[in-house]
Amino acid sequence: MTTLNFTKTEAPEWLLAMWKEIDDKTFGKGFDCFADDAVCNLGVADWRGREGIRESLREFIDKGMTTHHDVVEYWDGGSLKIFRGLVTMNFDDPAKEPVRPVMTHFFYMDKTDPAKVSRWVGSVGPTEF
C-alpha cells in the first residue's frame, strides 16, 4: 500500500499552459510538461510519447470543436497531481449544442525528472445521456 498526502493549491503554470495550448489550438510549448516517453490514457485513448500526445489531441480537437478548460480544483501529492475541472466544448456544427462536461485527470510525475509528467490518465463526461 502507498500513502500520499495531498495539498489543495492553485493549478501550476505547466498545467495552465497545456490547457491554453489546447484551447488556442496551438499545441506548442505547453506540451513540454510531458516526458519524451509519456503515456496518455484519456477514456479509450492510448497515446504514446510527448509528440504522440500532442498530435493525437490536435487531431481530436481539430475534428470540429473549440474548447475552453476551467480549473475547479487542483491537488498536489508530489509524485501524483489530481485536477478536476470543466471543459466547454463548442462545436463547429451549428446543429450541435455546446456542452460543458466535468473532467478529472491524474498526472503521474516522472521518477527521474519530477518536473515532467510521465503518465496522464483522465476522463471527460459524459457529454450526454
Locations of regions flagged by a protein language model:
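An acidic, carboxylate-rich microenvironment
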Residues: 29, 51-52
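A beta-strand edge to alpha-helix "cap/lid" segment located at domain peripheries
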Residues: 2-5, 10, 17, 41, ...
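Short, low-complexity N-terminal intrinsically disordered segments enriched in polar/charged residues
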Residues: 1-28, 32-33
